[in-house]
């Protein structure tokens, strides 16, 4: 039926229906658009929540691993601190009680050896006094390595041990003490002595290579000053193989998403000390 022949009532009804259809279509379209927008917001919010949860877990695990590594170095420091007290007590036998200097030096040398033997995880242990700071009798002990004394008589007992348990000892020479050749981080080799002497605090050296134990090993050193009457009279050093830190990194990686990630242990100078 032609539109012109429709009554005014039908025309109004059709026009109203078309308007309602357009409105409904518009509302449905807006609703679908809003639903899609809300879905995107929910998806983004969930992704952020999952990301934040993963970051929080990673942070907690990294702090846990950092505590394990810190505990490792703390144990070394505590051992060194206790050992330094034993060294101080032996020194007092000469300075206060008049015990024979030769006996004290041999006892100190044996103390270093025994201290290392009781800690199989350590590579080496040493005590190096300042000139004449032990007993004022360095001149009487030139080249007496069995008494822990070097070519000038300075006491500098050094003991190293291999994985087999074999132990070797030597007297730290003046050349070793004065060695300023650059290590991996550019610092002088004798930083082991300079750092505690200058800072009067315990020091942890950046990773470096050393072959004093018979094989070339990547290692680090914890050194402590022995202080008497406000002066540093000796340096105590503890050498640690970085294979131990490497194992800590591997263990940490296994506990983090079943080894799907990686763990790096980096020194303050940016040198890699352990990686998995």
Which role fits each region the language model picked out?
Residues 104-108, 121, 188-192, 245-248:
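Stable alpha-helical elements in mature extracytoplasmic
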Residues 1-5:
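Short, Lys/Arg-rich, polar N-terminal cytosolic tail immediately upstream
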Residues 215-220, 257-260:
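Short, small/polar residue-rich loop motifs at catalytic or cofactor-binding pockets
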Residues 107-115, 235, 239-276:
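Solvent-exposed, extracytoplasmic
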Residues 8-14, 19-111, 117-123, 202, ...:
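Juxtamembrane extracytoplasmic/periplasmic/luminal helical "stalk" adjacent to the first N-terminal
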